Amino acid sequence: MKPLFLQALMYPKLMPCRNMSGVEQELMVLAKEQEKEIKGFENIKFQSSVFDSIPYEVQAKELLKGIDSLHEYTGEFNEMLDVYKTQRISEIEAMFNKSEFTMGASQEILLDNRNKNWVKQLKEIMPKNNVFVAVGAGHLPGKNGVLNLLREQGYTVRPLVNK
């Protein structure tokens, strides 16, 4: 099994809340209740190929680092949740930049290239339809983040009021 997949399986078990469905799941339920069309930017095959693009040694190193830091994850998760809920985007970027895994070529593979592809897809979709776009927190900030890339294309990007 690939280290990235093991890591993805490990993280939910470390979260402070055991019944946490995740933001993505909650949005899916709301969309279905309101009979909204749900589309994804990528299929599973593509996502798997993204992981294959990252050298096995890098994946293994990050997995071991994660295992060695298990006790820190609860605090980091709570901090990330607070930063996300209060829309402090620059702090999200700082948190992701702490990880060696999201730096350099891995950041380009995991975030930057995918963000550019998503914005390209959005440019095709948005003129024809009203859309609600949800992406993981790491995809939001930075020069190559979805927010900045949309602004560079001339879109006005505003946060939703979080109540």
Language-model features, listed with the residues they occupy:
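Structured, acidic catalytic/metal-binding patches in enzyme active sites
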Residues: 1-110
